[in-house]
């Protein structure tokens, strides 16, 4: 379970998380909360970083009801690679002692420990900042990505939205824009088209690359969705990238010999 997905950039509400926690209690299952984008939420960034309210994690929501329901159904995983430096490849976990002890034992048997240099770097930074400094830092990172999101989406709206080539939901956290491309049907089993064929063939040849949605679907079903990222692309290249993507979608309709249908 995640608050903000690395696939679609969608974010679960606190109420939705409470419903899932209730199901975990009812059906006796464990929630593995993989949440590397928790600190990259774009709401509330004009407020004080130390005192402002932040979204609740599954772990935090479970703690709220400790006396009534108890705890132990959530193991939470976070990452420094999204908020300090991608090259650190360092994260941390929070959860029941028995489970984390088993994780430690498995780590000791498999790779002994994470690399020492990234660990020391993260320790020194966190020790220097303290909690207030850390919260100010992550909010500055979130503001950086929020600005990139705004520019990226504005160009997408201008190029893809106005031409009827794609639609999406504005991400409120993370670094991805999940696009539903308006593609011609590739057969009765794929009425909305196949983004993998489009990206791997036409888009790649045009010099633009997005991750086909099939990469994130467990059963490998074909889909019209693609994942685009606004994390590192140069802002001057965004419009051109979307223009190339638009053109290959329009070319797919022309090749199919059909007029492009309006988006629902």
Model regions: which residues?
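PLP-dependent class I/II
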Residues: 1-264
């Amino acid at each position: 379970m995640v608050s903000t997905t690395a696939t679609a950039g969608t974010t679960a509400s606190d109420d939705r998380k409470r419903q899932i926690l209730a199901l975990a209690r009812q059906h006796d299952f464990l929630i593995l909360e993989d949440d590397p984008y928790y600190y990259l939420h774009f709401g509330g960034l004009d407020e004080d970083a130390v005192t402002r309210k932040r979204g609740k994690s599954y772990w935090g929501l479970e703690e709220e009801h400790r006396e009534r329901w108890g705890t132990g159904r959530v193991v939470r995983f976070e990452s420094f690679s999204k908020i300090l430096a991608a090259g650190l490849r360092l994260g941390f976990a929070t959860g029941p002692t028995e489970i984390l002890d088993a994780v430690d034992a498995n780590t000791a048997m498999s790779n002994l420990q994470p690399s020492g240099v990234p660990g020391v770097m993260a320790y020194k930074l966190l020790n220097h900042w303290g909690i207030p400094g850390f919260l100010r830092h992550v909010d500055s990172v979130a503001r950086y990505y929020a600005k990139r999101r705004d520019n990226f989406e504005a160009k997408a709206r201008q190029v893809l939205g106005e031409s009827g080539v794609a639609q999406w939901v504005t991400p409120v956290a993370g670094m991805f824009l999940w696009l539903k491309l308006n593609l011609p049907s590739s057969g009765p089993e794929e009425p909305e088209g196949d983004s993998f064929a489009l990206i791997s063939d036409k888009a790649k040849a045009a010099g633009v690359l997005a991750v086909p949605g099939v990469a994130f679907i467990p059963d490998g079903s074909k889909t019209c969705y693609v994942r685009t990222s606004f994390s590192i692309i140069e802002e001057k290249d965004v419009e051109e990238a979307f223009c190339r993507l638009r053109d290959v979608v329009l070319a797919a309709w022309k090749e199919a010999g059909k007029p492009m249908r309006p988006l629902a």
